Amino acid sequence: MIRYLLSTLLLIFISACSDSNDTELNIPTVSGLEKLIEHSKEFEQQVISYETPGGKIHFAIGFGIANSIMVEGEGGNIIIDAADSVYEAERIYKLFSEKNSNPIEAIIYTHNHGDHTFGASHYLKIQDKKPQIIAHEDTDYYVQRIMGILNPIITKRSTRMFGTLLPEEDLINVGIGPHLSVSKSPTGYIKPDLTFEDNLNLNIAGIDIELYHAPGETNDQIFVWLPNHKSLMPGDNIYKTFPNLYTIRGTSHRDVKGWINSLDRMKMFNPEFLFPSHTKPIIGKKEIDDALNIYRDAIQYIHDQTIRLMNQGLYPDQIVEQIKLPDSIANSPYLYEFYGTVRWSVKSIFNGYLGWFGGNPSKLDPLTINEKAIRMSNLAGGNDKLLSELRNAVKNDDMQWALELSDHLIALDYLIEEVKDLRVEALIYEGSRSSNPNKRNYFLTSAFELNNGIIDTSLIDRTSEELLHQISIDTLFDVLSTRYNPEKHSDNNFTVCFVFSSNNTKNITLRNKVAVISNNITNNCNIKILTEELEFKKILIGLANPVSSIANGTIEIVKGNSTKFLQFLNKFR
């Protein structure tokens, strides 16, 4: 049934809970991680208060992955970034209110990521007057996309990257924060009600605020300039680690050139206080200017040298081996690879300009995974010899080679339990020794999954209707089209029409094994449904049963019959 169609919709990242029967990884204690362990001090949980020329600013760090900032105004305050969960927002605001308990007049999202937006609903619950929600005009589009068609895969990969399944003692940090807390409470995203394209000047609670579009880590990124406070909030365009020019959880191309331009634009304001959304503030004009220069120069170097070598005809894997940061900036603490890496960035820049094909003819239409595995086995002298090579690789701590060999044996489905155990050993070895938290957590979580099964992304809180009001019906129908199972296709040109009480209308036509979505009701409806948007949303995520909804009249079938409608819903899985 469609009950589990959108089972991951209400949560971007799943709970960091594990069953008592889960197999432990026995992650070893290794040397070489001293800098990463020391980096955890960057996120010591606290609220720091600053007296700026324009008034007090309070900075909460260490509560989940992202910082939250409160600026005091006249009879009211503003929040910049609302934390990664309602749970953390509640904890943060308890401390903020001890500093100043005036009502929150506005919440500003610096961009769409959940660690900056998912705590917002807490502020609607604690006061009668709804705070104004301010963001770039594209922010809601990107939130809807992540909570829509990309949700299942982003959920899985984010869980791996942030290590939310790992025992607390094995999670050192996540590079830009101590941990991700989004799973501890329902998602609290609230749609913006004031948006802008390039810049916006406001005065809220006596605070002069200038907002500027600053594409970088996201296309909708903004920075906040408070001229009277001499303070700038750069969002995620700078933090104390090498930038995530590409994130391994998966992302559309990040405009690296735009990121450089945004950092240059920030420099023009010559701020005295820089309050990033991750890691600690930077205080002092020179200190801020130096940090911004190092950051933008590093990004430009990686960008320009990738382009230079691309134009010489080198393939991505060749370019990766040639680009290292210049000695003059390589040892800056702002460029330690605790989040992004130079290698991943090079590949992303190449892909952003030229796409997935690196130029090597052998990679254009390569052998299938199974074909290559068979030929590797033949080359080794058979499956037993290939397995012997894998055993030797693990024995000799040649773990990257072990992972690649295990790929072939898994494709061959050969002695899968032993191969799995060897692969787990290789993943733990590589992950536990990595000083990059993204890689470390991804590898260790992948090992956990091999031992305990793939993440069950249906483990979510289905009880909250609040988020459904923030998710558009358009988003849900987009998801429907991507969940249509062509193996269940039977009726060509079969159309189901939906008329919602909001006066919105939707058609789904099944033809040529695709589900075609349109907004205008046709005269060719095989089934016609009258209902409320919220009721249909609840059905899609499993909060309501379509059989019960038909029986109690919250779904009315005015053309066709319930059997056909239920059969139709069952095609989307």
Regions found by a protein language model. Name each.
Residues 13-16:
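C-terminal motif of bacterial Sec signal peptides marking the signal peptidase cleavage site
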Residues 77-78, 84-86, 142-213, 258-270, ...:
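Metallo-beta-lactamase
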Residues 392, 398-404, 408-411, 420, ...:
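Feature captures hydrophobic
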